[in-house]
């Protein structure tokens, strides 16, 4: 990608609102407005990781995006999350997220036939929290909640190489 396109994308994705569920029992969503890639408050920090891909993820003919963000709620975990930003005809809006892993190492993020392909390292059960060693190559599909209630992202395959 050219530098100008990357700078423009980083400005957009680093200065928008992302939503997080406060838990199924509360049925609430917390909004985090990023400024220059960061949202910081006590016990709730969100960062844009400068990893993104464009595609038509809801198949409406408009350019959507998928980005990697991290969330930290005050503990030792930095939850790497895939966020789908869907074009509503005027702007990109965060519609769905999928937690990838605590401190995942993202090797690559690509668009493939309207889906997101991620090559990354995640934690094996016996890994220390500092260093994931399990390599996975997953394909993620955005699912419009109006078409399939309760589902927003589907993992289509999980290719694991130990």
Model-derived segments and their meaning:
Residues 59-70, 114-119:
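Acidic/hydrophobic-patterned starts of short beta strands in beta-sheet-rich repeat architectures
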Residues 42-43, 72-77, 126-132:
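Short consensus segments that form the blades of beta-propeller domains
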Residues 63-66, 77-81, 102-105, 132-137:
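Short, surface-exposed coil-to-beta transition loops
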Residues 1-46, 93-101:
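Blade-edge motifs of beta-propeller repeat domains
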Residues 52-60:
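Acidic, divalent-cation-chelating loop motifs in proteins
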Residues 47-52, 67-68:
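N-terminal post-signal-peptidase region of extra-cytosolic proteins
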Residues 1-26, 105-162:
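Acidic, small-residue rich beta-repeat scaffolds with periodic aromatic anchors
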Residues 80-100, 151:
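Extracellular C-terminal loop/segment signatures of secreted glycoproteins
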């Amino acid at each position: 990608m050219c530098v100008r396109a990357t700078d423009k994308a980083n400005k957009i994705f680093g200065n928008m609102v992302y939503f997080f569920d406060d838990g199924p029992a509360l049925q609430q969503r917390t909004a985090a407005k990023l400024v220059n890639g960061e949202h910081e408050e006590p016990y709730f920090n969100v960062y844009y990781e400068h990893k993104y891909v464009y595609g038509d993820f809801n198949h409406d003919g408009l350019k959507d995006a998928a980005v990697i963000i991290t969330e930290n709620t005050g503990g030792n975990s930095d939850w790497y999350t895939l966020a789908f930003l869907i074009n509503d005809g005027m702007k990109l809006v965060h519609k769905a997220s999928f937690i990838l892993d605590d401190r995942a190492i993202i090797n690559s993020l690509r668009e493939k036939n309207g889906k997101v392909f991620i090559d990354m390292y995640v934690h094996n059960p016996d890994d220390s929290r500092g260093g994931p060693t399990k390599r996975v190559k997953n394909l993620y599909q955005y699912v419009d909640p109006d078409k399939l209630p309760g589902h927003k992202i589907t993992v289509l395959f999980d290719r694991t190489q130990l």
